[in-house]
Amino acid sequence: MFVNLVLVAAMFRRVSGVVHTQELQPRFREIIVERGSFGGSEKVALITMRGLISSNLPGTVGDSMVDDLRSALQQARDDNRVKAVVLEIDSPGGEVTASDEIYNAVVKTRKRKPVVIYMDTLAASGGYYVSCGGKFLMANETTITGSIGVIIQTLNYEKLFDKVGLASVVFKSGKFKDMLNGARPMTPEERDYMQGFVMKIYDKFLGIVAKERNLPADNLRNTIADGRILSGKEALEHRLIDGVGELEDAFAKAKQLGGAPSATVVKYGPPFSLSRFFRAFGEAGDSKIKLELPKQFVPQLESGHVYLLPSFYAP
C-alpha cells in the first residue's frame, strides 16, 4: 500500500511538472488546413488575428491576445520545418502600443522567413499597421482597409453635471494633469497639446507605411492617409497592398516565397490544458442564460486612450 502511494505521488509530481512547464512555455497545437505531399515535412503556418487589438483582451495561452500572437510568431520562427507564415487579419485596429508590438513581432519573423498577410473582411487602421510588417500583402477586393490615422476621444458631461447638481473637484500638480476632465471644457492650450500629441503618433504610423510600402510620406499625407477607408481593390491601386485574392491564394504565395510548393498548411490553435478541459465542464454545468456579444464585437475603448481605429468604430 505504501509503495502504491509513493508511485502515485511520483506520477502526480511528474504530471504537475509537465503542466507547469507547458504553462511557462505555451506552445500552439497544429491543425491541418491543407495537406501537402505525402511524407513531406515542410509547413506553412497559418496564424490568425481577429477583433480589437488590445493588451486588455485575454489570450488563449498567454495573458493577452498580444502575448498569443507574439508567441505564435515565435513558434513559427523557431520551427525549421515552417518555411513561411500566413497571418490572417480581421481587425478594425485598436491600441497604438499593442499594434506596434505585434507589428514588430511580424517584422522579426519576416527577417527569418516570408510572412504573407491576408486581410479578411477588415484590416483597417491598427490592422493595417500590423499588416505593414509582412513581406507580401494580399486582400479580398471587398476588404475594408486603410484608415491611416490616430484617434483619442473623451466625453464632456459638464452640462449634465450642471443639470443634476454635481461638481468636479480636482487637485492637480500641473496645468495639464486633468486636461481630459469631462466636467469642464478644454482650454485652447490643452486642445493644441493633445492635437500635437496625436500628430506625433500619426507621423510614426505614416512613416511605417511610407517605409514598408516604399511610398513618399508627403504624397500619402496629402492623399489617402487622412483616415479614409479603402476597399481591397482601391488599396491595390494605391500600392498599399501587393495583390488581391482569396485565403488559398495567400497559401500559394507563401509556398512560393518559402520555396516549399508541396508544404502542408497548418493552423495554430490553443494547446490542450487540463485547466481549460475542466473549465469547459464547469461552464457546461452553468444553467444561467446569458445574452452577450463576443468581446471582440463590443467596443472596449477607454476615454483618453490612444487608438488606431476607423472613425465608424469609435462609439
Predicted ranges, named:
Residues 129-136:
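Alpha-helix C-terminal capping segments
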Residues 1-117, 121-124, 136-140, 152-315:
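N-terminal organellar transit peptides
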Residues 142-150:
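Active-site loop architecture of trypsin-fold serine endopeptidases
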